[in-house]
């Protein structure tokens, strides 16, 4: 495996055990430069409690979580009883939706896998502002600002979270240490499995706020963790986006970096 941090600058970004300090690995920037992308990748190794990033400043900058918020939204839905269990089916009302893959009945796992916005908007409406606010505080999730509308605050309004905070939240979920039942955390973790390779398992979620403009770009995310043997790697990637054709880069850039670190296949 290549060295985890070839060029190192250390900065304290958080008081948590996983990301109390983070090192800057500028060698990863070549993957961003090759695609003319402004973005950040944070990668943390659980056993050594070590984290690295290509961009220290951006790693702690907060952005709209977009559909990565489906992770806490699902847990909160289960905790409040809005989602009865992992077998609940969310019925399609037959009305046209923005994406054809949303136009069907969906399980919780299915709704997460296809990132069905209408399903999670309904969950948020049923949870309500008071309970939503309570759980975001319990989870220490981003800036915890849900103003602007209960069914859109994570899509276009004031909620913000950094890449560092994303990996902190994901570690707590992995360890079943969120202020939620172990059973409900396990349900959501299972729903997040996106790749099961012979040597590793990936749990992840994408997010996309829209393309924006060159002067005011949107944000695209990929966050999750990789289980490989006895090791766990937590990751969070975000990038500016002003052209939807660049959307696949939210996964291809971090995949190349993790492949270069010997974590997953390229």
UniProtKB/Swiss-Prot annotation:
One of its GO terms (biological process) is cell wall organization. The modification N6-carboxylysine is found at residue 70. InterPro entries: Bact_Transpept/Beta-Lactamase, Beta-lactam/transpept-like, Beta-lactam_class-D_AS, PCN-bd_Tpept. Its EC number is 3.5.2.6. PROSITE patterns: BETA_LACTAMASE_D. Gene3D superfamilies: DD-peptidase/beta-lactamase superfamily (3.40.710.10). Keywords: Antibiotic resistance, Hydrolase, Signal. NCBIfam families: bla_class_D_main, blaOXA-10_like. This is Beta-lactamase OXA-19. It comes from Pseudomonas aeruginosa. The lineage of its organism: Bacteria, Pseudomonadati, Pseudomonadota, Gammaproteobacteria, Pseudomonadales. The gene is bla.
């Amino acid at each position: 495996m290549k060295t985890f941090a070839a060029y190192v600058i250390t900065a304290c970004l958080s008081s948590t055990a996983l990301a109390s300090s983070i090192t800057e690995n500028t060698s990863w920037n070549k993957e961003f430069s090759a695609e003319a992308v402004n973005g950040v990748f944070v990668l943390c190794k659980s056993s050594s409690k070590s984290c690295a990033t290509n961009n220290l400043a951006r790693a702690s900058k907060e952005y709209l979580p977009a559909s990565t918020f489906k992770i806490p939204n699902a847990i909160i839905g289960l905790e409040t009883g809005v989602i009865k269990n992992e077998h609940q089916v969310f019925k399609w009302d037959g009305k046209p939706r923005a994406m054809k893959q949303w136009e069907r009945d969906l399980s919780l796992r299915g709704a997460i896998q296809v990132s069905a916005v209408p399903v999670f908007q309904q969950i948020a409406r049923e949870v309500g502002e008071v309970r939503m606010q309570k759980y975001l505080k319990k989870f220490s999730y981003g800036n915890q600002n849900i103003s602007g509308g209960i069914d859109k605050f994570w899509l276009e309004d004031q909620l913000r979270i950094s890449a560092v905070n994303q990996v902190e939240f994901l570690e707590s979920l992995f360890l079943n240490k969120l202020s939620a039942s172990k059973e409900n955390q396990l349900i959501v973790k299972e729903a997040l499995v996106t790749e099961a390779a012979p040597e590793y398992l990936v749990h992840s979620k994408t997010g996309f706020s829209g393309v924006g403009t060159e002067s005011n770009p949107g944000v695209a995310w990929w966050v999750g963790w990789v289980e490989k043997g006895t090791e766990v790697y937590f990751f969070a990637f975000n990038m500016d986006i002003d052209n939807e054709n660049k959307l696949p880069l939210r996964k291809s850039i971090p995949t190349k970096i993790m492949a270069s670190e010997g974590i997953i296949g390229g």
